């Protein structure tokens, strides 16, 4: 099968490309970029890949004629217009940006500060949280955000089994600098990041509304969450530490049972119990590892959720959606060995 990838120069696109190249069901990955005037060798755009495959100027008609699916690893605001030819043709689109994650256009406009995609397109978009949905027969798949993935996988058993007080959810999420994207800023400059930890976008991060939207799909009574984000002096990985109060009568055994049952057959979510996971054990893999503590004295449940933001939080989950859509094995093309040491 041939697939197209638009957006190879960003971190997410680079990692996705490397996984697509080794996928057993993919024979060819056609590369496109919106800013090119003519074909350009990939190694001129991304030297560390040592690959001279041509990257072509973006051409939707060429993709429709030659490929079976298209991946967009582009910034927010691109896909909502660039995807239109594919949607008209019922051609499979997997979008790694936030353009189709939110069902309410006004919510997108509020959080992304730009106009939303067409209402009709938002209605048919499929939110591809692969551990809780099936992308079979879907032609517009919105890949979840990295913070959203780590947070939702950590909260799902507690929300679905109605084990916690919904007004007490606190998420303290920390990420490596690759989560901020490739474009350098003053906050991602080495001298600012090194030997430092800095909060940013507290309660204003763009992933908050998609988290709340999915939580409400599991329990409509969810109203809001406290959500903070911290930039760490590491390259990759997310640690989301989640706190909530149990409902009266809920005990540790119920919480443990909920996590074990929810993820019993999930190939990429590993419940580690009270052995709290570290970022290092998942970087380079498509795993989400979840550790859980029940503090009876403080009457608080704590969940530690770790993922690689560029794999499970981006390209890896995109491939999971691709595998579902085209009936490949759930683990096809996905890495399971961490980058150690």
Curated annotation (Swiss-Prot):
Alphabetized InterPro entries for the sequence: AGPR_AS, AGPR_type-1, NAD(P)-bd_dom_sf, NAGSA_dehydrogenase, Semialdehyde_DH_NAD-bd
Cellular compartment(s): Cytoplasm
Pathway where it operates: Amino-acid biosynthesis; L-arginine biosynthesis; N(2)-acetyl-L-ornithine from L-glutamate: step 3/4
Active site, UniProt feature: 146
Alphabetical keyword list: Amino-acid biosynthesis, Arginine biosynthesis, Cytoplasm, NADP, Oxidoreductase
Top-rank taxon: Bacteria
Pfam families with a match to the protein in the record: Semialdhyde_dh, Semialdhyde_dhC_1
UniProt cross-references to CDD domains, sorted A to Z: AGPR_1_C, AGPR_1_N
UniProt-listed GO biological process terms: L-arginine biosynthetic process
Top class in the EC scheme: oxidoreductase
GO molecular function, one term: NADP+ binding
Enzyme Commission number(s): 1.2.1.38
Cellular component, GO, one term: cytoplasm
Record Gene3D superfamilies: Dihydrodipicolinate Reductase, domain 2, NAD(P)-binding Rossmann-like Domain
Catalysed reactions, as listed in the record: N-acetyl-L-glutamate 5-semialdehyde + phosphate + NADP(+) = N-acetyl-L-glutamyl 5-phosphate + NADPH + H(+)
Matches recorded under PANTHER family: N-ACETYL-GAMMA-GLUTAMYL-PHOSPHATE REDUCTASE, CHLOROPLASTIC-RELATED, N-ACETYL-GAMMA-GLUTAMYL-PHOSPHATE REDUCTASE, CHLOROPLASTIC-RELATED-RELATED
Family matches, as HAMAP family: ArgC_type1
Xref: NCBIfam families: argC
Protein family (similarity comment): Belongs to the NAGSA dehydrogenase family. Type 1 subfamily.
Biological function: Catalyzes the NADPH-dependent reduction of N-acetyl-5-glutamyl phosphate to yield N-acetyl-L-glutamate 5-semialdehyde.
Entry protein name: N-acetyl-gamma-glutamyl-phosphate reductase
Annotated organism of origin: Limosilactobacillus fermentum (strain NBRC 3956 / LMG 18251) (Lactobacillus fermentum)
Upper taxonomic lineage: Bacteria, Bacillati, Bacillota, Bacilli, Lactobacillales
């Amino acid at each position: 099968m041939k697939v197209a990838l638009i957006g190879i120069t960003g971190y997410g696109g680079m990692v996705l490309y490397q996984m697509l190249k080794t996928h057993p069901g993919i024979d060819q990955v056609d590369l496109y970029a919106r800013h090119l005037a003519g074909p350009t060798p990939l190694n001129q755009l991304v030297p560390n890949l040592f690959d001279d495959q041509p990257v072509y100027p973006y051409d939707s008609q060429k993709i429709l004629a030659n490929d079976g699916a298209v991946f967009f690893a582009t910034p927010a605001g691109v896909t909502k217009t660039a995807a239109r030819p594919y949607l008209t043709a019922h051609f499979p689109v997997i979008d790694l940006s936030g353009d189709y994650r939110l069902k309410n256009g006004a919510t997108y406009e509020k959080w992304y500060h730009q106009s939303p995609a067409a209402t009709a397109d938002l209605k048919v978009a499929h939110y591809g949280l692969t551990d809780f949905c099936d992308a079979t027969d879907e032609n517009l798949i919105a890949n979840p955000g990295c913070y959203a993935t780590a947070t939702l996988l950590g909260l799902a058993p507690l929300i679905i089994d109605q084990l916690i007080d919904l007004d007490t959810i606190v998420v303290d999420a920390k990420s490596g600098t690759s989560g901020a994207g490739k474009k350098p800023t003053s906050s991602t400059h080495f001298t600012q990041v090194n030997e430092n930890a800095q909060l940013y976008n507290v309660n204003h991060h763009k992933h908050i509304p998609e988290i709340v939207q999915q939580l409400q799909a599991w329990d409509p009574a969810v109203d809001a969450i406290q959500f903070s984000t911290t930039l760490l002096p590491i390259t990759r990985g997310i640690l989301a530490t989640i706190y909530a109060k149990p409902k009266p009568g809920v005990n540790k055994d119920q919480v443990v049972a909920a996590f074990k049952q929810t993820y019993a057959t999930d190939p990429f979510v590993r419940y580690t119990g009270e052995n709290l996971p570290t970022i290092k054990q998942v970087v380079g893999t498509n795993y989400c590892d979840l550790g859980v503590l029940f503090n009876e004295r403080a009457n608080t449940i704590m969940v530690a959720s770790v993922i690689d933001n560029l794999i499970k939080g981006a390209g890896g989950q995109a491939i999971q959606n691709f595998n579902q859509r085209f009936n490949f094995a759930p683990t096809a093309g996905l890495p399971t060995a961490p980058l150690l040491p």
